[in-house]
Amino acid sequence: MACGEKKTNSPSRTPPVQERNAMSSSLFFFLLLILLLFFFTSPTGAAFFFALAPPTPPAHLRFEEANQFHNSDICPSASAGVGRATACDPSYVHIAMTLDSHYLRGSIAAVYSILWHTSCPDTMFFHFIAPAGGHDGDDDELPGRLGSIVRSVFPSLRFEVYTFQEELVSGLISSSVRQTLENPLNYARVYLADLLDPCVHRVVYLDSDVVVVDDVRLLWDDAAARLASAAAVVAAPEYCHANFTRYFTSAFWAEGGARVFAGRRRRPCYFNTGVMVMDLRRWRAGGYRRRIERWMEVQRERRIYELGSLPPFLLVLAGEVEGLDHRWNQHGLGGDNLTGECRWLHPGPVSLMHWSGKGKPWDRLDAGSPCPVDHLWHPYDLFIRPSSGTDILAFFILYWSS
């Protein structure tokens, strides 16, 4: 060895400090794994964890934020900003829908489809009708909470949430062939003229189980032209080939029910109230709310129909509706009211698909047994499927072992 040269030895083992650090890291990750196992598999742990976390919507009400859409150059100018202060702008297309926790997923998909396909998304104004309180004490259905979820999904959407006092109609509802048809919110469409600002002269009412695959302004403009040329209060696709008599009991017809429709402007035909354009000024002036309520009172005294909110509309309006193209309500995609079997689209062009009937696309997709037509609804679904505690735990295990 040369004079002054310092002797060095190659390390044969990890220095004590590094070894202690490695042991500490392993112990930390082991303890983290135990804590995660406790948090996500123990009810007590999960409750403690989520109590510390920021408040978030329940798992069945979580949605991703929608893409932003903007007006094309051909669109009419609208007031700046969002909110009810500009609801009276004459350039707006007014769309009314109901909101509740079970159908919220459908409502959000419907809104997304409308924004997706219209050339003027900034001119859409939505009017959401929500129950005053949750059904059976379910606070998830409080109007403010539902409105907050809608705002989180569509930050720039112009909308208003209206509280529907269900006691207005609950005493008039009779039993139906399907329990969901007895929900008071199904009758909110009868009260739109009372709920919305008087400056809103016309509104498109849509059920929550629809998606629009065309520009809704085409529906709006066509209905406006048809309503202006007639004394009608409602424009909707009509189906005169349907057996109209089956919507009422044999006792109704035996007792002279046909006289109800005498003197109408045209032959009374079936129309689906899940897609209709309403002239609210004529609705108010003609006292249509009270006309429908009177038939519901008759139904409570003696059964004259079986199908929830539809028959009273038919009794008052069939034969007085301005017909719209069938493309605006490809209905029945949810099957019938009892079995919900799969159905396909009717022949002809499609601008709006409607899963009326028992089967809803989100329920069938989640159950792993979708109908072919349900896959046409799926691209508009913004629902975030909840991850189980096992899924989260597996993620951490894979991450730290990689």
Can you name each region flagged by the protein language model?
Residues 2-402:
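Glycosyltransferase catalytic domains, chiefly GT-A lineage
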